[in-house]
Design a protein with these regions (language model features):
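Extracellular interaction modules
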Residues: 1
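Claisen-condensing/thiolase-fold acyl-transfer catalytic domains that form or cleave C-C bonds
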Residues: 4-112
Length: 112
């Protein structure tokens, strides 16, 4: 079983702001009623654990290639090659993606 404490970095689907809040609560990264506070705290402390490259809103949303771009970011993070946005001491990363209108989702866990 995977626990929140096992995930060091995550790329979650955030093409719309509400998607990030829904994803982190449904993935168990935070409690359902705490996702807004969690994201606010990440921002205020400059913690890049969630969407270290700025998410889909900040880095772009390449239709048809979103999942692979998120996967590349997590793999690059785990390899220690993310330069300025590198998070230290990573062992486990998570990639979450959704299709149009949330009709399907995928979740992948990568380990170093």
């Amino acid at each position: 079983m995977l626990f929140r404490s096992d995930i060091n970095v995550a790329e979650v689907h955030d093409a719309f702001s509400v998607c990030e809040l829904m994803a982190i609560s449904e993935l168990g990264i935070t409690a359902n009623d705490k996702s807004g506070e969690f994201v606010r705290d990440l921002f205020n402390t400059e913690n890049r654990m969630i969407n270290p490259r700025g998410g889909l809103i900040g880095a772009g949303h390449p239709l048809g290639a979103t999942g692979i771009s998120q996967t590349i970011e997590i793999a690059t993070q785990l390899r220690g090659k993310s330069e300025k946005r590198q998070i230290s001491n990573l062992k486990t990363g998570l990639v979450h993606n959704m299709s149009a209108a949330g009709t399907s989702s995928s979740v992948m866990v990568l380990e170093n």
